[in-house]
């Protein structure tokens, strides 16, 4: 059970960090949505 909790926390933390960086800085990956 502990492994599942730690995995969930790790994924959620990485997701939040990636989300924050993605919205703070312009995505370096070419996206068709922007232009």
From Swiss-Prot:
Protein location: Plastid, Chloroplast thylakoid membrane
InterPro entries for the chain: PSII_PsbT, PSII_PsbT_sf
SUPFAM superfamilies in the cross-refs: Photosystem II reaction center protein T, PsbT (SSF161029)
Pfam families, sorted: PsbT
GO biological process: photosynthesis
GO cellular component annotations of the record: chloroplast thylakoid membrane; photosystem II reaction center
Cysteine disulfide partners in this protein: none
Keywords noted in UniProt: Chloroplast, Membrane, Photosynthesis, Photosystem II, Plastid, Thylakoid, Transmembrane, Transmembrane helix
Function: Found at the monomer-monomer interface of the photosystem II (PS II) dimer, plays a role in assembly and dimerization of PSII. PSII is a light-driven water plastoquinone oxidoreductase, using light energy to abstract electrons from H(2)O, generating a proton gradient subsequently used for ATP formation.
HAMAP family listed in its UniProt record: PSII_PsbT
Protein name (record): Photosystem II reaction center protein T
Organism name: Drimys granadensis
UniProt lineage: Eukaryota, Viridiplantae, Streptophyta, Embryophyta, Tracheophyta
Gene that encodes the chain: psbT
